């Protein structure tokens, strides 16, 4: 099975005026979803198209943006490949960008190659595009994705008719509609539109295909959706804290997760600490929630380097460790303090180990690590950067992948605390985690925690 280290974001806009600057701005607000590649396509009689290796604001020049003429277009930020991808087809030029992961990419590519199709590198975006192109029209092509693809996708397709936006039938990855008097937009996160003076209209429904043009938003097809399976990791980590995903404020969900951790400490006899602190920036919302419930003073213990990339979305472990070191430096205030340190999750354990080590080296008296997510037990098949069971720290201690009792969880926490050098470690239980997200359990994908896929793989 293939597990792509993938985080990415899409943005599209149909405007009354030239749109390239707006797409550039929208992608900048989605940059946290992927920093390795970026691209913009616009339509003006034909598709204008530019992609880069690197960050949006570092690479697109004013001259390039001026060359991207047209009043509607799409953009993409990614960890893995260049998107959007432009195609000449029998229905005219199109450009395609998506967020997600095609699990059965190898099988689909082999089938297409046996039928005479060629591929550049076999990227998921090539497979998705070719499935769309094989059909007589874009709507039929997007519809065919639900029949052929195992995995997740939220996508935008640029055409002469406008922009088609669609979400897979489970709604794994977010996709939001919004706009103002000058434009209609679609984005992986609401923050892009909120910060561009746009109103948030609604989420694209699982299986919905929306056409965005001068008339606004038109649902041109609604595919049957077996169930919702929104990625729970969006609220815990992936999405920006100022976004709203499927009707839930990310900030509220993270505050709830922190409060839940504090409540568990209170229920288990309380904890004596001087300060509660986040691992920036992923632990901020959780730490604020913990502070609110516990009444322990909130205090930063790390100085965050805003110019460093997200370490979790770096491709290699060496790159992650180097980036993590660049991101954070310890504040001397920590000396002699008992610290509750909050973060979203423990994946491989390397980064939290180094942070605990740095804090103790700086003189912290005690470090109590509190983690918002339950232990990660399974690699994600649907697009988050975890590749194999062997890389997951919790799985090294729970070989079956199933935590069946509170006693088993407590034992795991003690083993991880010893491994990372912390005085204690606690995770949210699965029940507490789901309750904090304010979304029914049967509307979430929790596969990385419990190994249960919402669809047949």
Regions found by a protein language model. Name each.
Residues 1-206, 211-274, 279, 366:
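Conserved short alpha-helical segments that host acidic/polar catalytic motifs at enzyme active sites
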Residues 18, 104, 172-173, 193-194, ...:
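Flexible loop/turn segments at secondary-structure boundaries
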Residues 37-41, 300-305, 367-373:
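A generic structural motif
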Residues 192, 199, 207, 263-265, ...:
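Phosphate/diphosphate-binding loops
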Residues 255, 259, 263, 284, ...:
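Feature representing long, continuous alpha-helical segments
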Residues 289-339, 350-353, 377-389:
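Short, glycine/charge-rich flexible loops or terminal/linker lids adjacent to PRPP-binding catalytic cores
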């Amino acid at each position: 099975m293939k597990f792509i280290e993938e985080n990415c974001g899409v943005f599209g806009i149909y405007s009354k005026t030239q749109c390239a600057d707006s797409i550039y701005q929208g992608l900048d607000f989605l940059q946290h979803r992927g920093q390795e590649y970026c691209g913009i396509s616009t339509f003006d009689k034909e598709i204008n198209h530019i992609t880069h290796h690197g960050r949006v604001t570092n690479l697109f020049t004013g001259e390039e943006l001026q060359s991207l003429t047209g009043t509607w277009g799409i953009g993409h930020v990614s960890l893995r490949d260049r998107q959007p991808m432009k195609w000449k087809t029998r229905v005219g030029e199109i450009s395609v960008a998506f967020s997600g992961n095609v699990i059965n990419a190898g099988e689909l590519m082999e089938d297409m190659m046996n039928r005479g199709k060629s591929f550049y590198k076999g990227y998921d975006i090539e497979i998705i595009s070719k499935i769309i192109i094989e059909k007589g029209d874009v709507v039929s092509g997007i519809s065919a994705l639900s029949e052929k693809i195992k995995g997740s996708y939220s996508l935008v397709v640029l055409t002469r008719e406008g922009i088609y936006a669609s979400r897979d039938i489970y709604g794994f990855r977010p996709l939001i509609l919004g706009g103002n008097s000058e434009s209609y937009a679609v984005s992986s996160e609401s923050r892009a539109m909120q910060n561009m003076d746009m109103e948030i209209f609604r989420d694209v429904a699982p299986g919905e295909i929306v056409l965005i043009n001068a008339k606004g938003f038109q649902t041109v097809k609604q595919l049957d959706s077996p169930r919702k399976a929104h990625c729970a990791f969006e609220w815990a980590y992936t999405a920006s804290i100022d976004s709203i995903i499927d009707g839930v404020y990310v900030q509220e969900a993270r505050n709830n997760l922190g409060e839940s951790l504090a409540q568990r400490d209170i229920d288990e006899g309380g904890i004596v600490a001087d300060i509660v602190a986040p691992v920036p920036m992923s632990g901020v919302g959780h730490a604020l929630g913990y502070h609110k419930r516990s009444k322990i003073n909130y205090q930063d213990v790390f100085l965050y380097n805003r110019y460093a990339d997200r370490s979790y979305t770096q491709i290699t472990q060496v790159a992650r460790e180097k980036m993590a070191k660049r991101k954070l430096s310890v504040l001397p205030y920590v000396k002699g303090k008992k610290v509750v340190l909050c973060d979203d999750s423990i994946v491989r354990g390397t980064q939290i180990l180094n942070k605990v080590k740095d804090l103790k080296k700086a003189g912290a008296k005690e470090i109590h690590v509190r983690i918002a997510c339950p232990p990660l037990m399974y690699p994600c098949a649907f697009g988050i950067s975890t590749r194999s069971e062997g890389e997951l720290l919790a799985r090294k201690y729970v070989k079956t992948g199933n935590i069946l009792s509170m006693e088993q969880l407590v034992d795991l926490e003690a083993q991880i605390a010893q491994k990372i050098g912390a005085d204690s470690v606690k995770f949210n239980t699965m029940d507490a985690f789901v309750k904090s997200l304010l979304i029914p359990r049967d509307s979430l994908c929790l596969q990385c925690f419990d190994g249960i896929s919402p669809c047949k793989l």
